[in-house]
């Protein structure tokens, strides 16, 4: 009987929580986001929780953008750009200066850490910081979720099975979130960020409920037309070729939009060449057409994916290109911009998206 008891009795072994969270050195902050323990790429500094930029983008809010070359953090709002410099308590919302009572952005080498308080200003999330070990529980998934109540004081184990080490103790009436169901065990998340297993018989009142919080999401508007858009490319290679617009319009029946190839990226500093024509725009408007001028990253000074990356990965270079583009648009009365970039590598994708965001704000 003693042998059987030893074989089948629950283990009292405690799991190494630093190992569980992946903590390898002092000062690291473990992170649980919704139902996932992620790499401990956080830290506590001056009493504030900071999360590494890569974790923020991947798990919390992908709209944050860090430029390590120019040491600036950006966040795009519908009509404004938020910018933060390293080590500062101040930040800009377009031209308006605002301040917090903590340093918003810290760096270690080229790695950026963003204050969780600042992240939460722009993210529909809740979080709580706990000790022993230092960890943060972040909830950002809202809507329907399955929960249950702990029936009696018990343990959350690392894996399903009574011989698996204990992660945490839970008390009668505690509520846990159900992550997965197995035959005799359920994978659960505790309110303080442990994800492990509890026996089915130790749970009761399983139910699906809707969780939410008060948060005013930013409204990103768009433009739509009440007609079918029929657009023609107009390959314009020099200023003289702009004179062929009337012939182009006459040859194309049912057009609503024409896209002349007027703008070409000149170099990796964000300068551009333009052959835009106000007369061309006037002729098109008289014919009832909108002009959506194209900007290209080819047939100009950019000749490779690497050069497009050099251009778009620097915030000042994107800004230079956007300012020149908007200036030309306003000068000749263009109705829209057609971005025709074809030298975008996978590594450049995040920078290209940021370019489009910044361009949309200026538009």
Would you name each region that the model predicts?
Residues 167-180, 190, 230-287:
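Conserved, compact domain cores that house catalytic/ligand-binding motifs in diverse enzymes
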Residues 75, 173, 185-190, 198:
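SH3/SH3-like beta-barrel fold
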Residues 153-155, 194, 199-246:
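Boundary/entry segment of secreted carbohydrate-active catalytic domains
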Residues 36, 78-80, 89, 143, ...:
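Solvent-exposed coil/turn segments that connect beta secondary-structure elements
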């Amino acid at each position: 009987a003693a042998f059987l008891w030893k074989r089948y009795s629950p283990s009292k072994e405690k799991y190494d929580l630093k190992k569980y969270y992946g903590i390898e050195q002092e000062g690291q902050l473990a992170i649980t986001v919704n139902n996932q323990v992620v790499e401990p790429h956080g830290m506590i500094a001056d009493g504030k929780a900071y999360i590494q930029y890569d974790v923020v983008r991947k798990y919390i809010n992908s709209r944050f953008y860090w430029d390590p070359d120019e040491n600036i953090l950006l966040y795009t709002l519908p009509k404004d750009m938020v910018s933060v410099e390293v080590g500062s308590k101040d930040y800009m919302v377009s031209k308006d200066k605002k301040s917090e009572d903590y340093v918003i952005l810290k760096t270690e080498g080229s790695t950026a850490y963003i204050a969780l308080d600042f992240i939460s200003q722009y993210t529909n999330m809740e979080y709580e910081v706990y000790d022993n070990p230092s960890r943060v529980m972040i909830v950002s998934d809202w809507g329907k979720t399955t929960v249950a109540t702990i029936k009696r004081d018990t343990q959350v184990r690392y894996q399903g099975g009574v011989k698996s080490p204990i992660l945490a103790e839970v008390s009668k009436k505690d509520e846990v979130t159900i992550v997965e169901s197995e035959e005799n065990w359920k994978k659960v998340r505790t309110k303080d960020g442990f994800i492990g297993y509890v026996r089915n018989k130790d749970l009761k009142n399983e139910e699906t409920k809707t969780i939410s919080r008060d948060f005013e999401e930013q409204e990103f508007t768009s433009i739509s037309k009440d007609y079918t858009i029929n657009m023609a490319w107009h390959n314009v290679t020099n200023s003289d070729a702009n004179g062929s617009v009337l012939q182009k319009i006459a040859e194309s029946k049912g057009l609503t939009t024409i896209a002349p190839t007027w703008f070409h990226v000149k170099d990796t500093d964000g300068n551009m060449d333009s052959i835009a024509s106000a007369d061309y725009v006037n002729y098109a408007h008289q014919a009832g057409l909108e002009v959506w001028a194209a900007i290209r990253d080819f047939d100009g000074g950019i000749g490779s994916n690497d050069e497009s990356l050099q251009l778009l990965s620097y915030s000042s270079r994107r800004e230079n290109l956007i300012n020149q583009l908007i200036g030309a648009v306003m000068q000749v009365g263009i109705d829209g911009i057609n971005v025709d970039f074809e030298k975008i590598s996978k590594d450049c994708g995040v920078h290209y998206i940021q370019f489009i965001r910044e361009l949309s704000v200026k538009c």
